[in-house]
Structures are given as C-alpha cells and as structure tokens.
C-alpha cells in the first residue's frame, strides 16, 4: 500500500485539531508540524511564548530553508503506508516537499478572525496569543509564510463557523472518502 498524505491547513484557531480528532477516530496517524516548531522553540529559548514561536519559525526557515519543517516531518513519516494526516502545512514550498514524497491532497479549515480569536483564548495552548494585537501579528506571520496560498489551493474546504459537531462530521466524511478512495486505488493497482 502506498503512502497518501492529507495535508491540513488553516489559520490558528480555525479548527485543524477537529480534523486531527476525526482522523484518529478513523485510525489514521496524525503528525503536527507545529510540534517541530514548539520543540525547537523550547530548545532554543526554554520558554514558549507567541514571540519565541514567531522568532523560531522565522529563524529555522532562514537558517535551514523554507522547507525545513516539512523535511523534519517527512523524517517522522518515511516508513508509513496508507493514509496519514499532516496537520499544519503553511506554505506551497512545504506542499511541494510532500508532493515529491507521496500523493497528497490539501484539506483546509476556515473560520473568521473573531471566531478564531475566541477559540484561541479558550484553549490556552503554550505560544498562543492572549490579546488581539498578538493574534493579528501571528496571523500576519502565518500569511507571510504563504498559508493563504495553501488555503486558496485546497482540494477540500471545511468552513468552521458552526458547532464542533458540524465541523467534525464534515472532516470525518471527507477523510472517510479519502480512505475509501485510497483503498480502492491500491486494490486496482
């Protein structure tokens, strides 16, 4: 069975973790690209804040290339087969790295800035902004990496302005179809 990668993209707080939960419920492995930056931030600064996360993101891409986080993620998935989910792709450069490695699709999750800000304040994850100004700075950083281009070119889109259940159902149904398609494609080969 070949590797098939579902690349999940979305602005912070859009609901990418709902896609990850649906994937896990379907038995799919999930890899979070943000974990690479969180680990590197912790190593470099000993503390994870919005500022240290932004600086680490810029620094590793400047020192090691725009594709650094994707390459580090591929190191984690290189022995995998079947459908896997990679959460947090941020640029078309990263998408190209994955496309060279395996068949891919992009699943984008979208929510308005106001909705995302409220979610981020509630989840209280290390490195998350706790005020509107930092939230906007983080959004601008994400957009500078090219995240908007990835979302614009997505193969599938979930608009997540409603309930968690609605977003989960949408994600689950899309992922289930992709798993079924992958199984059929592999049985045909």
Swiss-Prot record:
GO terms for molecular function: ATP binding. ATP binds at residues 10-17. InterPro entries: NTP_hydrolase-rel, P-loop_NTPase. The keyword ATP-binding applies. Keywords: ATP-binding, Nucleotide-binding. Belongs to the UPF0200 family. This is UPF0200 protein Smar_1234. It comes from Staphylothermus marinus (strain ATCC 43588 / DSM 3639 / JCM 9404 / F1).
